[in-house]
Amino acid sequence: MLKPLGDRVIIEVTEAAEETVGGIVLASNAKDKPVTGKVVAAGTGYVLNDGTVRDLTVKVGDEVLFDKYAGQEVSFEGQDYLALHEKDIVAVVE
């Protein structure tokens, strides 16, 4: 499994819908980039100026919303993930 460093998290991205609620099939270029996903791994936290570490707000298993163009796409063992900084996460879905 991937183990992110510092304030980074690994997200399993939720796929964009293939069709609308009304049943219209979307072309591949018409689908928005997904902005939701599940945290599958989290780093140790932020290192502050005094050397202490502040824990991350998100944890493994959280469903999150993130900035549309945030992070870096990563493939590991045939699975695609998104690696991003916690600051790029907008909200946790409860």
Swiss-Prot record:
Keywords: Chaperone, Cytoplasm. Its main location: cytoplasm. It is found in: Cytoplasm. Together with the chaperonin GroEL, plays an essential role in assisting protein folding. The GroEL-GroES system forms a nano-cage that allows encapsulation of the non-native substrate proteins and provides a physical environment optimized to promote and accelerate protein folding. GroES binds to the apical surface of the GroEL ring, thereby capping the opening of the GroEL channel. This is Co-chaperonin GroES. Belongs to the GroES chaperonin family. GO terms for molecular function: ATP binding; metal ion binding; protein folding chaperone; protein-folding chaperone binding; unfolded protein binding. Heptamer of 7 subunits arranged in a ring. Interacts with the chaperonin GroEL. GO terms for biological process: chaperone cofactor-dependent protein refolding. InterPro entries: Chaperonin_GroES, Chaperonin_GroES_sf, Chaprnonin_Cpn10_CS, GroES-like_sf. One of its GO terms (cellular component) is cytoplasm.
